[in-house]
A protein has these predicted regions:
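A general structural signal for short secondary-structure junctions and capping/turn motifs
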Residues: 102-107, 135-137
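Histidine-centered nuclease catalytic patch
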Residues: 66-104
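Nuclease and nuclease-like effector domains acting on nucleic acids or nucleotide cofactors
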Residues: 1-68, 88-89, 126-149
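Residues that cap or delimit alpha-helices
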Residues: 30, 93-94, 115
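Short Cys/His-centered divalent metal-binding micro-motifs
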Residues: 104-130
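Short runs of predominantly hydrophobic/aromatic residues within well-ordered alpha helices
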Residues: 37-38, 72, 108-111
């Protein structure tokens, strides 16, 4: 576990440099540039180290159980996560790297299992214009989550 957290910390250190390095430009960028920056930071979040024991919420959809398929769905879409991170005031944090690691491990890296069909269905409810919370997105998509029993 310690080794995993070290890997996350190492990558988050680099990600934080990217975020802080682009923030000033991001705030004055036009909407097309902002979307590009958000997509790029979102992709970087995707490449942070995975560990199912740490990041899996323990929830699976009824449809995924019925179809016997597991597709990972992150509670917070990458673009939403990127936007939040780009708008975060990192200067007020005494240990911004630790904050970013914690945000990834407790929020942005977390995922449930859903069916492939549900994963596609969720897309329209996870767009930045409509996304409010993971619970609302799942409810709007008609997805019921239950505890995963191996």
């Amino acid at each position: 576990m310690k080794n995993y957290e070290d890997k996350v910390k190492h990558k988050c250190s680099a990600l934080l440099k990217l975020i802080c390095g682009i923030q000033e430009f991001y705030f004055s960028a036009n909407s097309e540039q902002k979307r590009f920056i958000e997509t790029t930071i979102g992709a970087a979040i995707w490449y942070l180290p995975k560990n199912n024991k740490v990041l899996f919420t323990g929830k699976i959809s009824l449809d995924a159980i019925k179809k016997n398929e597991k597709s990972e769905d992150h509670l917070f879409p990458r673009k939403i996560a990127a936007t939040e991170l780009l708008n975060f005031n990192w200067n007020k944090e005494s240990d911004p790297e630790k904050v970013l690691v914690e945000l990834f491990l407790s929020k942005y890296g977390k995922f449930n299992y859903v069916s492939k069909f549900e994963n596609k269905k969720l897309i329209k409810y996870q767009k930045s214009e409509v996304f409010k919370t993971p619970e609302i997105a799942y409810s709007n998509a008609g997805i019921t989550l239950v505890d995963f029993k191996k």
